Amino acid sequence: MKEGIHPDYHEITAKCSCGHVFVTRSTGKDLNLDVCSECHPFYTGKQKVLDTGGRIDRFKKRFAVLGGKN
């Protein structure tokens, strides 16, 4: 490999707003994150499930007159 053509690849810290800190390597500067795998609802299992059942029932009732499958 040629000398002097590669960017400076060094350790950085990525700090989340929840307090979790990751150490990784990059050519950039330290990162401040809003969410991470420790606090994001998808990864923690605390997801909100949207109530779409009411919308589906309304759709079925509205278009039941057309005589489609039940």
Swiss-Prot record:
InterPro entries: Ribosomal_bL28/bL31-like_sf, Ribosomal_bL31, Ribosomal_bL31_A, Ribosomal_bL31_sf. It comes from the Bacteria. GO terms for biological process: translation. One of its GO terms (cellular component) is ribosome. Binds 1 zinc ion per subunit. Disulfide bonds: none annotated. The keyword Zinc applies. Its cofactor is Zn(2+). Zn(2+) binds at C16, C18, C36, C39. Keywords: Metal-binding, Ribonucleoprotein, Ribosomal protein, RNA-binding, rRNA-binding, Zinc. One of its GO terms (molecular function) is rRNA binding. Belongs to the bacterial ribosomal protein bL31 family. Type A subfamily. Part of the 50S ribosomal subunit. Binds the 23S rRNA. This is Large ribosomal subunit protein bL31. It comes from Tolumonas auensis (strain DSM 9187 / NBRC 110442 / TA 4).
